[in-house]
Amino acid sequence: MELALNEDGRSWVRTRAWVEGQLAPGERIVAAERLRGGWTSEMRRLRVEGPGTGRDLVLRSFVLPFFLEHADGLLTREADVLDLLGPTTVPTAGLVAVDSTGAHCDHPSLLMTLLPGTVRLDDGPDADHRAELLASQLAAIHRTAADGRRRPRGYQAWTAPDRVRVPEHTTRPELWRRAVHVLRQAPPPYTGRFLHRDFHPGNVLFSGEGPGLRISGVVDWVETSWGPADLDVAHCSTALALLHGAPAGLRFPDRYRAAGGELAPSAGARRHWRLLDALAFAPDAEKVAVPWRELGRTDLTPAVLTTRLEDYVAGVLARP
């Protein structure tokens, strides 16, 4: 299988040599397939075969200028998290090797094992069951112990009052004014928890059907942080609202609490974290929409996503 160039013409000669240097004697790469559904990095499934054996690995490489600048921190963080979570019940990939600076590869890269399962974003009959499993999995992630040097960095907010991009043709400007006003208040105090920080259906793999449906993998740990559990819950809530409609997002915090998770005691604090996340998606959630459309959700047009986001923000503001 020729891996010298990818579809954009970038060289992968050094990366391939580095990957093969991590393999067992006699193993070699025989095929590569681009994995879709992400936008921050290029992901490839690599088929590796050796004498009487075969296995699949996943290669993450940062190639875009912004992420090249931050690749060292992102990939080092993910490598540390995979190592931390390895002995736990959280279904994560196993770390094989990392070149966080691109010293040996064409681009900064991380090599890991392949997890079973697929991303499922459809509006099918098991969407509610998937949401329950997401809530249970997120509560388990938040119970991860990470003290001292193993504790990740503090969370970073992904928007601010003056950075919110209000939809150009909104018919509800007062809704956005009220939402932005909430963000102008100081962040509420919180009890720190181990956060995935980008937990949503696009970063979770499912296996099985019906009663046998289960989560078989949680991926993309480059943003792992220490912060309020509400922020992770808010992020998944916003994503569910965009994928399935505002009610799905508004129900998720209750599912999380039913699964044993703990949220901020005051309604005002919970509202702050949910709006801090939701307003980062304005005006039309394009960053997640592109990979979601690649995975089959072509119905998620900018107009649909803007309407769902506004409906969700209205629901958050209306909740006591």
Q: Residues of each region from the PLM?
A:
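Actinobacteria-biased recognition of intrinsically disordered, low-complexity terminal regions
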Residues: 1-9
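An alpha-helical support segment within catalytic cores of ATP-dependent transferases
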Residues: 10-26, 127, 140-197, 201-213, ...
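ATP-binding pocket architecture of kinase catalytic cores
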Residues: 33-154, 174
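Active-site acidic catalytic loop and adjacent metal/ATP-binding pocket
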Residues: 36, 40-48, 58-59, 95, ...
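Short, flexible/disordered intra-domain loops and linkers
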Residues: 3-4, 65-73, 289-301
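Active-site activation/catalytic loop segments of kinase-like enzymes and analogous catalytic loops
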Residues: 231-262, 276-294
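Helical subdomain adjoining the active site within ATP-dependent kinase catalytic cores
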Residues: 284-320
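Conserved N-terminal boundary motif of the eukaryotic protein kinase catalytic domain
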Residues: 26-33
